[in-house]
From Swiss-Prot:
PANTHER family named in the record: LIPOPROTEIN SIGNAL PEPTIDASE
Catalytic activity: Release of signal peptides from bacterial membrane prolipoproteins. Hydrolyzes -Xaa-Yaa-Zaa-|-(S,diacylglyceryl)Cys-, in which Xaa is hydrophobic (preferably Leu), and Yaa (Ala or Ser) and Zaa (Gly or Ala) have small, neutral side chains
Cellular component, GO, one term: plasma membrane
Catalytic EC class: hydrolase
Organism: Halalkalibacterium halodurans (strain ATCC BAA-125 / DSM 18197 / FERM 7344 / JCM 9153 / C-125) (Bacillus halodurans)
InterPro entries per UniProt: Peptidase_A8
Protein name: Lipoprotein signal peptidase
Gene name in the database record: lspA
Location of this chain's protein in the cell: Cell membrane
Pfam families hit by this protein: Peptidase_A8
């Protein structure tokens, strides 16, 4: 149950921050937070990461629905006794639903975190995107750890 609360907190934080951007900023407006490094920039994305598949909303609806159903299934069946796995899935679930809400009600995703890494202007993102990336990163690291553990047990 706690993991669904984590997902809900991600969704609420994501939607609240997007609401603030939509309400208080014009599209394209940028507010420096840390000059040359971090900006709040009001941006809209009609596609996926990096703007790919722009205008393919029906595809996002189908994929997101399948992903959400799969995550809930795994949270109920597989992750009950694995806190790391459940946390990763909760982050992914919250992020997926956060962006799904935008696609359903706005027809686009509100992005606003604009960072520069050295001279590279990283694609603008939001709270949901961050949760998705952290969740996937945790899953990736968990898979590596589990694989190493299985090899170690096999060789013992």
């Amino acid at each position: 149950m706690i993991y669904y609360i984590v997902a809900l907190v991600i969704i609420l934080l994501d939607q609240w921050t997007k609401w603030l951007v939509v309400r208080h900023m014009e599209i394209g407006e940028s507010i420096p937070l840390l000059d040359s490094v971090l900006y709040l920039t009001s941006h809209r994305n009609k596609g996926a990461a990096f703007g790919i598949l722009e205008g393919q909303m029906w595809l996002f609806y189908i994929i997101t629905s399948i992903v959400v159903i799969g995550i809930v299934y795994y949270m109920e069946k597989e992750a009950k006794h694995d806190r790391v796995f459940a946390t990763a899935l909760a982050l992914i679930l919250g992020g997926a639903i956060g962006n799904f809400i935008d696609r359903i009600f706005r027809g686009e995703v509100v992005d606003f975190v604009n960072t520069y890494i050295f001279t590279y202007n990283f694609p603008i993102f939001n709270v949901a995107d961050s949760a998705l990336c952290v969740g996937v990163g945790i899953l990736f690291l968990k898979m590596i750890r589990d694989e190493r553990k299985a090899k170690k047990e096999k060789n013992a």
